[in-house]
A protein has these predicted regions:
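Divalent metal-binding segments
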Residues: 1, 6-85, 104-161, 174-177, ...
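Histidine/acidic-residue-rich catalytic or RNA/ligand-binding cores of hydrolases
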Residues: 53-54, 162-170, 197, 216-223
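Alpha-helical structural signal in soluble globular domains
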Residues: 56-64, 144, 168-175, 195-198, ...
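Loop/turn elements at helix/coil->beta-strand transitions in domains of secreted/extracellular proteins
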Residues: 66-69, 95-98, 148-149, 180-181, ...
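Short amphipathic alpha-helices and their capping/turn segments at secondary-structure boundaries
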Residues: 80-102, 191-205
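Structural recognition of alpha->loop->beta junctions
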Residues: 90-98, 172-187, 191, 237-238, ...
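Non-cysteine beta-strand/loop elements that form the S-adenosyl-L-methionine
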Residues: 96-114, 203-214
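Active-site-adjacent C-terminal substructures of enzyme catalytic domains
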Residues: 190-243
Length: 243
């Protein structure tokens, strides 16, 4: 919902809801970790951790109260990435917490028609989705990650979003060191067929979540049409290519 001037209704709520204090944030983190452990998880990847949240995680690890392993990713080109660049890749002495990656965002989601496509949405002529971060900003953050030896994990869902990220990785990663850097594309849901082999060629990890195939089943065909579905949720093709 939004007002006539396109101000999100949520902005009215955000303006009056107080920010969570340190005690509340710590309690929320403890509950999330405990629930993860209860469900049998031994480790998680937390995609987008601020420097303040990392400090909270460190305090729990220091006290021996981190019940599972946490692979934390810095929240974009912000304070946590700057800290990684200045201090080096981080691993807690206890071995259960590390930060050695940054999470970036290229485009939006498929269901809301925000995933960036090369051609129009099949059910929305004239709309090709959007880049939630400018191409220049994402490329600058990737270049920074390369300089700092930090793994870049970039959200890309549409075929245009994936192509932009693959192009940036190809251009910015040292050719003789690409696979060792273990750069990832998060989700890689809709990929142009000609771009599928590039994951293996560039040593890029396709970090895909099976639940997206089932959650998108009601609308994926309508959004992108039968032809583009050939490059969608392509686990078998990517595995066969060596990705």
């Amino acid at each position: 919902l939004s007002l006539h001037d396109a101000l999100p209704i949520s902005a009215l709520v955000d303006a009056v809801v107080p920010a969570p204090d340190l005690a509340l944030r710590r309690r929320a983190l403890e509950l999330a970790l405990a629930e993860s452990a209860r469900l049998g998880l031994t480790g998680v990847h937390d995609a987008g951790v601020s420097l303040d949240t990392l400090r909270l995680m460190q305090s729990l690890a220091d006290a021996g109260r981190l019940p599972i392993r946490v692979y934390a990713m810095a929240d974009g080109d912000a304070a946590a990435l700057d800290w990684l660049c200045a201090s080096g890749l981080y691993t807690h002495p206890g071995g259960r917490l590390q930060m050695r990656a940054v999470k970036l965002y290229m485009d939006g989601a498929l269901g809301s028609r925000g995933a960036a496509l090369i051609e129009d949405y099949s059910d929305d002529a004239g709309n090709r989705g959007l880049l939630v971060t400018s191409q220049a900003q994402v490329e600058a953050a990737i270049a920074k990650a390369v300089r700092c030896n930090v793994q870049a994990n970039t959200h890309a869902i549409g075929d245009r979003g994936n192509r932009i990220v693959l192009d940036a990785y190809e251009r910015l990663l040292p050719e003789d060191d690409r696979a060792a850097r273990r750069f990832r594309i998060e989700h890689a849901q809709i990929v142009a067929p000609e771009d599928l082999p590039r994951f293996a060629q560039l040593g890029v990890i396709a970090s895909m979540q099976p639940i997206h195939a089932t959650s998108d089943m009601p609308w994926a065909g309508a959004r992108v049409g039968a032809d583009r579905l050939r490059g969608a949720y392509a686990w078998q093709v990517l595995l066969g290519s060596g990705a």
